[in-house]
Amino acid sequence: MTPMGALADDPAWAAAFLQRMTRMVARDFNHPSIIVWSLGNESGYGAAHEAMYHWTKRADPSRPIQYEGGGSATSATDIICPMYARTDTDMPQGPDLAPKPGLIKWAGLGGENRPIILCEYAHAMGNSLGNFSDYWDAFRKYPRLQGGFIWDWVDQGLNKTDEHGRTVWAYGGDFGDEKNDRQFCINGLVFPDRSPHPTLLEAKRCQQPFTAKLRSRDEISVTVTSEYLFRATANERLHWQYLDEKRVIDSGDVALDLLPGEVSSVPLFPKDLQQRAASWLNVWITQVESTDWSEPGHEVA
């Protein structure tokens, strides 16, 4: 079998590799939305990648470079960027390859301080994202684990009427094509029309910028943590409901006043705190005013 990096080590292909990189950097250099350069995807590792890396670092020392090929941690990447690594266990990769370390183990390996960002993870096909919270627990606990890119955002399907007259999303094989990608076109967080899958709610819950934990049952106060990095909570309100198995006993809302990264105790003062067999506290946070991307009342956590 030809090694995946065969072309990257073939001098005949060196100019093609470099041209692809130099043209991309020239085209996108002045776009502020570009925060990381990529050398490509799933093309092994070889001398051409090293040449692309060093040319780009000279042309633009302000941005980091990421490349997963060759084991995710070669000298041609500023970010360790594994694909589908597990959180706490190693992953076998075949008889001739060393196991891919679990993320927590990877973060503790000596002699290395590059950030770890999964270039792909949480393959969002079908009834997926069941262990998504495990990743985000690890991201929050270990500073070198800095997130990842979900594969992927949107289903690749086309609107089609089936033999029963129903409108369906068509994909691999639905157009009489015998060689196709089957259901691997349908692995996003949203449908082709951008309406959400249930998995989008799971992603939102794990990635929300606030956490709230019950601090005291006696007085019903919660500890709220803001994960905003740059701004205070000037546009957020915390809403709450105190209820038992039969009814909502009390409810209210309070303005949040947190600096970036601040942790604060928020007393809620519900009425009627008599002892009950079971009671619950629901807490959610909304935005008061509209933003460039949300309407008033949008729930952020």
For every predicted segment, state its role.
Residues 138-301:
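Carbohydrate-binding surfaces of carbohydrate-active enzymes
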Residues 1-185:
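Substrate-binding/catalytic cleft of secreted carbohydrate-active enzymes
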